[in-house]
Amino acid sequence: MGEVYEKNNIDFDSIAKMLLIKYKDFILSKFKKAAPVENIRFQNLVHTNQFAQGVLGQSQHLCTVYDNPSWHSIVLETLDLDLIYKNVDKEFAKDGHAEGENIYTDYLVKELLRYFKQDFFKWCNKPDCNHCGQNTSENMTPLGSQGPNGEESKFNCGTVEIYKCNRCGNITRFPRYNDPIKLLETRKGRCGEWCNLFTLILKSFGLDVRYVWNREDHVWCEYFSNFLNRWVHVDSCEQSFDQPYIYSINWNKKMSYCIAFGKDGVVDVSKRYILQNELPRDQIKEEDLKFLCQFITKRLRYSLNDDEIYQLACRDEQEQIELIRGKTQETKSESVSAASKSSNRGRESGSADWKAQRGEDGK
C-alpha cells in the first residue's frame, strides 16, 4: 500500500508552477511585436474607417500628453497642497483608517474632486465682460466663433467664442484652450477644459489615470484604485467618484461609444457606462474595434519588461470580465437604486438650455 501511495503522490505545487509559467509565456506572446498580418490589417483599417482614424489620432495624443514631469511640477506648485492633504487626513482619520492603508489614495482623489470643483476651477456658460468685470456673464450675447489669434494659438487653442456685452457694447473673446498649463491660469471652461486639466492633476499626484472619450460629446476620467483593485469612474464636472451610471440613468443621456485612453492601453469601456439608452454602434465592426484597441495597446507596451506586461495583462483580463458581466448584479442594482433615489436627476454643471440641447438634463 505504501508503494502505491508513493506512485500516486503527485507534486501539485510543481505542476501549478509549470502551468503558471506556460500561461505567462502565452500572455507575453500576445504582446510581442505584431505579426505582419496584424500590421496589414491595422493599416487597412485606419485607411478605410474614419472612426478608427479618430481613435488612433486621439491615442497618439491622449496616451502620452499627460506624462510630462515639468507639467506635474507646475501643477503641484499651483495647488494648495496643505489644504488638500489636511482635508484628506481629516476624512481618513474620521472614518477610522490607520496610516499606511492603500485606501488613502481614494480619499485623496475624492478631495481633489471637491477642491477642483468648489475651490479652484469655474464653469463657464458665457464669459464675464472684460470691461464690466465679474458677474456680468448674463449680459453677454454670443456672436459666433472664429479662429485663434497669434497669442491664443500658442496655447493649443482650436476655436474662440465671441461675445458682445449688452451693457457696454464691448467684445469679449473666450478662447477654448487645450493646453492644460494655460488652464491652470485661466481656471475656467466647460467639460473639455475640466477633464483636460483634472486628468493632468491626477497624473501629477502619481496616479494611474485614463481619459475617457464619449462620442456624444462628453469626457471624464478613470483612475486605477489599488484598494478597490479596479478602474474607478471620476468626473470633475460633477464631483463624481465611482458613479458610472450617472450618464445613462441620472442624465438619461443616449450614448454609443466610450473609449478610455491611458499610457498603457486603449480600451472600449462602453459597457461600464451605457446601462440604458444605447445608440446604434454602427461606426465600426465590433471585431475591428476590439482589434484596433488591442493593437494600439500592444504598441504602447512594447518597451515594457515581461513582468510589467504580464501584470497589466492580468489587470486587463479582470477588467474584461467586469465589462462582459456589466457589473455584478448586486453592484448594478445598487447603482440603479441610488440613481433613481437621487433628488438631483440630470447634470449639475452647465446652463439649463445647454444641458437640454445635449440631452443631459435627465428628461
Swiss-Prot record:
Compartments it resides in: Cytoplasm; Nucleus
Binding site for substrate: E238
Chain residues that bind Zn(2+): C129, C132, C165, C168
Effect of C129 to A/S: Abolishes enzyme activity
GO MF, one example: metal ion binding
Effect of Y273A: Abolishes enzyme activity
Similarity field: Belongs to the transglutaminase-like superfamily. PNGase family.
Protein name: Peptide-N(4)-(N-acetyl-beta-glucosaminyl)asparagine amidase
Record organism: Saccharomyces cerevisiae (strain ATCC 204508 / S288c) (Baker's yeast)
Gene it is expressed from: PNG1
